[in-house]
Amino acid sequence: MHVAALQNHLAPLLVPCSRVYAACMAVRRRFWESPMSPAFRPSRPVVSVGNIAWGGTGKTPLVDWLLHWAGTRGLNPAVLTRGYGAKPPTVPFLVGSQHTAEEAGDEPLMLARRNPYAAVLVDPVRRRAGRWAEHELRPHFYLLDDGMQHLAVRRDLDLVVLRPDDVLDQWGRVLPAGSWREGASALKSATAFFVKSSPEVFEALAPVLEERLAPYGVPVFSFWLRPSGLLRVGGNEQRPHFDGAPYVLVSGVGGPGQVGETATRYFGYAPVRHRVFPDHHPYGPDDVRSLAQEGAQLVCTPKDAVKLERFAGLDLWTFDLQTVFGPAIGTAAPFPQWWDERWARLARERAGTS
């Protein structure tokens, strides 16, 4: 039985537990946000990118876009991330392009390679990593990855990523009766909301987005991932497409359905097979042998590529992905323009308090 169906079936038992859990999380939030809490406030601005629900929502592409934005402006940011599944030799662990996904985690390694001017720090205690960066690196600003519930580091801006389902069937459904980590009151902290969806889906969602998110008084932006080409994993070769040849899609991410839609839209035809692995899957030799026997071109996500590149002899391609912003609610400005203006205001505010 699917998790959501099981939660619906057990709702009479789970809903009371959810209310208790949501109340505990609200108390926790009030404690960490109080002036008396031991939360760490760096001397430079902190931008949190997080989500209300568990699972993949598109946080990493948004973090990647912000890092690219910083690089084009000569800014050196520091990313504070837990590094899901990482086994770093020391903490905090400053990720470099030479490290492995096992050491750094798949997403931190991908971010570090795509943005070499950024300091990507893996540490389950992000407050400790922030203090280390404050002393050793002096970054221009901090990005708190998956930071909505990580309140031990104070933030100036809270960018909250939502899935379409979060504003539909899962709205307000807190663990264990739903997928939300906190109750709807936590959304009051948001500086802006983001929904990873195509413009068509976002337009269809607009009425419910306005009804449920308008009370928070902040803009809602849409974004999606658009491939600009294919890159050979472990090499430098590039190509635009497979010339109509069949392909097998490989993904171990939180939203495999969206990966399939992206691939089909890019190639103009669906994969002959979609090999779906769990999120953050640690690929092993058996997986690679199975993939090598597929008999078609193999294409994977960049997140999977950093884990599969170590296997020699696997003819594998990955997407060169770009984050694209679309329609918005609550502002006439496209997100890049809104962000430039919001960042300039934050920089002035922090300069005035330093």
Swiss-Prot record:
Protein's organism: Nitratidesulfovibrio vulgaris (strain ATCC 29579 / DSM 644 / CCUG 34227 / NCIMB 8303 / VKM B-1760 / Hildenborough) (Desulfovibrio vulgaris)
Name of the protein in question: Tetraacyldisaccharide 4'-kinase
Gene Ontology CC: one annotated term: plasma membrane
Function: Transfers the gamma-phosphate of ATP to the 4'-position of a tetraacyldisaccharide 1-phosphate intermediate (termed DS-1-P) to form tetraacyldisaccharide 1,4'-bis-phosphate (lipid IVA).
UniProtKB keywords: ATP-binding, Kinase, Lipid A biosynthesis, Lipid biosynthesis, Lipid metabolism, Nucleotide-binding, Transferase
Database matches in NCBIfam families: lpxK (TIGR00682)
Biological process according to GO: lipid A biosynthetic process; lipopolysaccharide core region biosynthetic process
Gene Ontology molecular function terms on file: ATP binding; tetraacyldisaccharide 4'-kinase activity
Residues annotated as binding ATP: A53, W54, G55, G56, T57, G58, K59, T60
Family under the similarity heading: Belongs to the LpxK family.
EC number: 2.7.1.130
Pathway as given in its UniProt record: Glycolipid biosynthesis; lipid IV(A) biosynthesis; lipid IV(A) from (3R)-3-hydroxytetradecanoyl-[acyl-carrier-protein] and UDP-N-acetyl-alpha-D-glucosamine: step 6/6
Xref: InterPro entries: LpxK, P-loop_NTPase
Reaction catalysed by this enzyme: a lipid A disaccharide + ATP = a lipid IVA + ADP + H(+)
